[in-house]
């Protein structure tokens, strides 16, 4: 019995939504640690800022006046948006002033950008096709940035030879999420979905490789004093 490709694609899409929800929740242990220690230590907010922007764009994309009949897009990304806001609020609460200022600066730029996109699309594009194309292209671009954001942490892992600040759960779920949505995109080939998720698969695999390469070194360091780079060395601008 040959299954309908559309039916298979829908099933993969539902699985993808569930995995995406898991991806949003995967950093939770990191923030539990931050709350317990009342210190963000060397954790960086870059992945959460990137995910915040990505989710906000996809929510906008899924609205009825941009791309009708996209309720699943709105619900999963709306949920993700709320979760990222919670993560950023926790980070802000326990970060030192320089890190707070940096985070607020990036967040302000993102909000201004979102407002500009909304105004430009609603006032300048008057058909669903044009609005969907413009916002969809932005979603692809910033979705790629979301997956690339952990490069900051990967750089830190290599510099410190420690995986302490690269959560394994986040890396694993990112990898699985990328695979799922890449398969979804290939069933009925969609380049807009393939590009960011294909990159997500590759970067997720790279993070897992780094994790297993440096896990023993991280364990050894944790037995003594863990020497971490200064803020200027551990984060990308």
Swiss-Prot record:
An annotated GO cellular component: membrane
Family in the record: Belongs to the SWEET sugar transporter family.
Any GO BP: galactose transmembrane transport
Stretches in topological domain Cytoplasmic: 32-46, 92-102, 154-166, 212-237
Keywords attached to this entry: Auxin signaling pathway, Cell membrane, Membrane, Repeat, Sugar transport, Transmembrane, Transmembrane helix, Transport
One Pfam short name: MtN3_slv
Transmembrane residue ranges: 11-31, 47-67, 71-91, 103-123, 133-153, 167-187, 191-211
Source organism: Oryza sativa subsp. japonica
Extracellular domain ranges by topology: 1-10, 68-70, 124-132, 188-190
Gene3D superfamilies assigned to the protein according to its UniProt record, in alphabetical order: 1.20.1280.290
Subunit composition and interactions: Forms homooligomers and/or heterooligomers.
Protein name in the entry: Bidirectional sugar transporter SWEET5
């Amino acid at each position: 019995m040959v299954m309908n490709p559309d039916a298979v694609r829908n099933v993969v899409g539902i699985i993808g939504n569930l995995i995406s929800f898991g991806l949003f929740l995967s950093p939770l242990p990191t923030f539990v640690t931050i709350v317990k220690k009342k210190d963000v230590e060397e954790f960086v907010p870059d992945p959460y800022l990137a995910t915040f922007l990505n989710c906000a764009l996809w929510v906008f994309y899924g609205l009825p006046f941009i791309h009708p009949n996209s309720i699943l897009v709105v619900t999963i990304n709306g949920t993700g948006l709320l979760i990222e806001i919670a993560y950023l609020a926790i980070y802000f609460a326990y970060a030192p002033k320089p890190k707070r200022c940096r985070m607020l600066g990036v967040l302000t730029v993102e909000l201004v950008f979102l407002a500009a996109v909304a105004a430009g699309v609603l006032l300048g594009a008057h058909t669903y096709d044009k609005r969907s194309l413009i916002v969809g292209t932005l979603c692809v671009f910033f979705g790629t940035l979301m997956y690339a954001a952990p490069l900051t942490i990967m750089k830190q892992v290599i510099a410190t030879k420690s995986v302490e600040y690269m959560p394994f759960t986040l890396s694993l779920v990112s990898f699985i999420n990328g695979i799922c949505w890449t398969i979804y995109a290939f069933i009925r080939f969609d380049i807009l979905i393939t590009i960011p998720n294909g990159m997500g698969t590759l970067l997720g695999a790279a993070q897992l490789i780094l994790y297993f390469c440096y896990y023993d070194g991280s364990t050894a360091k944790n037995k003594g004093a863990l020497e971490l780079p200064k803020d200027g060395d551990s984060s990308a601008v």
